[in-house]
Amino acid sequence: MGINQSDSCYLTPVPHEQRRSPTTMGLLWITMTTAFPAVLIGFEWHKQGFSFSQILFCSVLGCIFLLAYAIPASLLGAKSGLGYCGLSRVVFGRWGTRLVAANLIWMSVVWYGIFAVLMAQAVNDLLQVHYSMTVMAIIFGLLMAFNNFFGFAGIANFARFIAAPVLIAWVGYTFFKTINMVPHAALFEPSHQPMMTALTVTSSFVIGFAVWGNEPDYWRYSKPCSLRIAIPMVIALLIGQVIFPITGWLISQTTGITNSDTATAFLNNYSFAGFAIIGLFVLAASYFATNDSILFGSDAALETIWPMKHKTAIIILAMVGAVTAAIFSVNDSIKTLSVITDLSCIFLPVPTVIMITEWWLREKFFRLPIDFANVPALIELPAIDWPAIIALLAGFVVGTVTSGWIPGLESLHVGICSIQAWLTSAFIYTVLRVREYRMETVGQALIPEITEQATESILIEP
């Protein structure tokens, strides 16, 4: 992803002199959160009957919720210089750290697989060929590991400085071209869906698609400044999670297209006059760069929990990702993407929310700053940190139950499942952690008194 893993150990804070500039980090994050599938989901939302005003309002609201999480998560990485797995050791204990790492790995593999499928789909749609989706998805799943395997920075740099700006310019040009063609009355038409349904579906996608969960893995390379983190995040979300899906909705409104395959081909003809190779080139760079970043984070989790050679870890992750892509290739890619975003907005951020809560409690209430310079080895950790594990599982349960994906519990599909999961985990962890801290404080206060009483009893004995 353009940041060499040899720069520093995963469990050692990144030195300040090795931190990247705001421009580099900003371009990196924009590349990671502005992707073409966000345009395709706009077609799906139009098909489901959501109005323009609903899409606009719910997308912006979802971005605000996401920023409330992502800025503290990224700032924690920048202040500590540590990544996701290093920070998790401070909070979750030995087995909890393994659980958190495994959680990140399986979700990353799922994302890796769907982007390989989307790349295969782009080839078929733009070149108007009918190659086997399964075979192509497997091939791309393996090829997308090339950059991480050999440690080249050129592909990621090309994606940041060329492909991402071209993709943004492509969608931006389409947005301004289309919005002038849509009758103003269409922008204010009433919706066929309740506002709460629109909020649940739209905001969950925005959060699930743009959240990474392991933001500290990337922002540990940034200088600790809230403004330097917030500005690129706001820009990235405005482009990738507001303008991109609205563009898809506008085109669907204008053309009546609802199928993602047809939509990709139409966008290429609409913007590049049918030069398919240009659109394919831009999408390939974007998808390859995204999976490059996904592998970077999942490799960090795998290597810090189960030590192995870097290339061995990449081979394992790429092969599992390719198999996952093969499984996804036989299903509707947009529906699969929607399911993944619903799961992602729950399972990826909840552990980080707990880490943020611990950091906040230590800074504001306990007055016990974390020693980021010394990350304990796994063997030095307690087996289980119960407050963190209970809060983690509670967040997972609440988010999953309210996501609407469990048969028989559709009636509980209300609100934004991710926000409910985050608030649950933060609240439960705060209550349990404060209780634990008070018990520890009382215990430490009693030690001198107990020692004094024991000494007196010894002296009194004949």
Each predicted region: which residue ranges?
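Hydrophobic transmembrane alpha-helices that form the core helical bundles
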Residues: 97-129, 284-304
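Transmembrane alpha-helical segments of multi-pass small-molecule transport proteins
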Residues: 101-105, 126-150, 164-175, 197-213, ...
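Hydrophobic, membrane-embedded alpha-helices of multi-pass small-molecule transporters
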Residues: 20-39, 174-180, 188-251, 272-292, ...
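Membrane-interface loop-to-helix entry segments
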Residues: 120, 135, 139-177, 189-192, ...
